[in-house]
């Protein structure tokens, strides 16, 4: 998993609340069990005018030329609500997004994102609105998300602080998924196993 320390990138926004996982990645695209290849289906029902995904919707934000290559997504409260599917952060990451900034997230989506190297950043509604206004007013506007300092820096230079559980921050800073986190304690696990009485082995 790619470590997340600090990232500066083009920002795009979807100014909507309660964006659920079926909107992020519709159920008909969930048959794969590997993480790659989901980005093309991200927000399928909004991005395309046809079921096959051949006709882009020119009015959808992510399809606008000025936002091509965006790596930071701004959204409103309760992002990632709905059914539990790890494919949602897979699709967002495969599309090229590194961080999602919103006032709140659904709990399961929040945890799944951290486990898959996608940083969910909670800011106040007013702070998110300021970021959206700045991004909308300036083509090519970039935002910096610094996990080492837990700060978001707006296109104008305004700084906003955010919090993240230290365990989640450690995993993201070091690029550790659940398996990687376990392997990082290999020495301690080995010592524990070496000291297990023979009758318990």
Curated annotation (Swiss-Prot):
GO cellular component, one term: 3-isopropylmalate dehydratase complex
Entry superkingdom: Bacteria
EC numbers on record: 4.2.1.33
Catalysed reaction equations from the record: (2R,3S)-3-isopropylmalate = (2S)-2-isopropylmalate
Keyword list, A-Z: Amino-acid biosynthesis, Branched-chain amino acid biosynthesis, Leucine biosynthesis, Lyase
Biological or metabolic pathway of the protein: Amino-acid biosynthesis; L-leucine biosynthesis; L-leucine from 3-methyl-2-oxobutanoate: step 2/4
GO molecular function: 3-isopropylmalate dehydratase activity
CDD domains (UniProt xref): IPMI_Swivel
GO biological process, one term: L-leucine biosynthetic process
Function, as annotated: Catalyzes the isomerization between 2-isopropylmalate and 3-isopropylmalate, via the formation of 2-isopropylmaleate.
PANTHER family recorded: 3-ISOPROPYLMALATE DEHYDRATASE SMALL SUBUNIT, 3-ISOPROPYLMALATE DEHYDRATASE SMALL SUBUNIT 2-RELATED-RELATED
Subunit and interaction comment: Heterodimer of LeuC and LeuD.
Protein's UniProt name: 3-isopropylmalate dehydratase small subunit
Organism lineage: Bacteria, Pseudomonadati, Pseudomonadota, Gammaproteobacteria, Alteromonadales
Encoding gene per record: leuD
